[in-house]
Regions:
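Short beta-strand-centered segments at strand-helix junctions
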Residues: 51-99, 104-187, 191-195, 203-234
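Short, low-complexity, charged amphipathic interaction modules
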Residues: 1-40
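C-terminal functional extensions of proteins
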Residues: 232, 238-243
Length: 243
């Protein structure tokens, strides 16, 4: 029955029409939430609030190295989902061996990748006695050799673009939808302004674009400590307005 008489005053309510309107408004709310914060144009830039993730030292592993470190047939198990859909902090840990010292219980992130890599902060590199490059991933020719030890074995990553250790370049994950809307290109460099106890602007945020990604800037612990922020706080991404 499409219409029901209101008990109080005899008015009729179009239930079907009301339901459609409620669903329409809910759809708008969901779409706005998924789209995230909207940019504001100011002084030749789009200023867009962006969540910041502080990346603690961690390891990515290829399937072959998972088997060596944790045993044949072992699969990484999820401990906690990360902000990016499909990515997680695994329950597994490894020991990272440097020239001077070792760092134990370094978290593995999943899922597995085509090659293994170790992402560290400069402070970690000093503890290990390593001189590490700033790079985007373990396929970078400048990545350094490093040894990982797990409960079932050890593996040495060769570096030089074949998987290794490096200091992660400050970067952001951007969805293809946001990129198209703002005219941003993959591997473009943008600036990030951060308010707080130590307000600053970080230059050279490398943009990496992929369908389905959630917009998020990644800094390492040294950078986060330097500007006094933690994961989950927001900064302002500065995107030049194209003519």
């Amino acid at each position: 029955m499409d219409q029901i008489a209101a008990a109080s005053n005899g008015r009729t309510i179009n239930v079907e029409g009301l339901s459609k309107e409620v669903l329409r408004r809910l759809g708008e709310i969901v779409a706005q939430a998924e789209a995230g914060p909207q940019p504001v144009q100011h002084d030749g830039f789009y200023e867009m609030p962006i969540p910041i993730g502080i990346s603690v030292r961690h390891v990515h592993l290829c399937p072959e190295h998972v088997a060596i470190l944790f045993g044949e047939g072992h699969n990484l198990s999820s401990y906690q989902e990360l902000y990016q859909k499909g990515y997680y902090a695994a329950r597994e840990h490894v020991m990272v061996v440097g020239r001077k010292r070792c760092i134990e219980a370094v978290r593995v992130l999943g899922p597995t990748r085509p090659y293994s890599q170790v992402e560290l902060a400069q402070t970690d590199a000093l503890v290990l006695g390593l001189k590490l490059p700033i790079a985007t991933d373990g396929a970078d020719p400048a990545s350094a050799p490093i040894t990982l030890v797990g409960p079932e074995g050890a593996v040495t990553l060769p570096g030089k673009g074949k998987g290794g250790a490096f200091i992660a370049r400050r970067h952001m994950h951007m969805s293809d939808i946001t990129a198209r809307k703002l005219g941003v290109k993959d591997r473009e460099l943008l600036d990030l302004h951060i308010d707080g106890p130590r307000p600053t602007t970080l230059h050279g945020i490398l943009v990496r674009i992929q369908a389905g990604w959630r917009d998020e800037v990644h800094l390492d612990t040294d950078e986060g400590n330097a500007v006094g922020i933690r994961s989950g706080q927001t900064g302002t991404l500065m995107i030049p307005v194209r003519a």
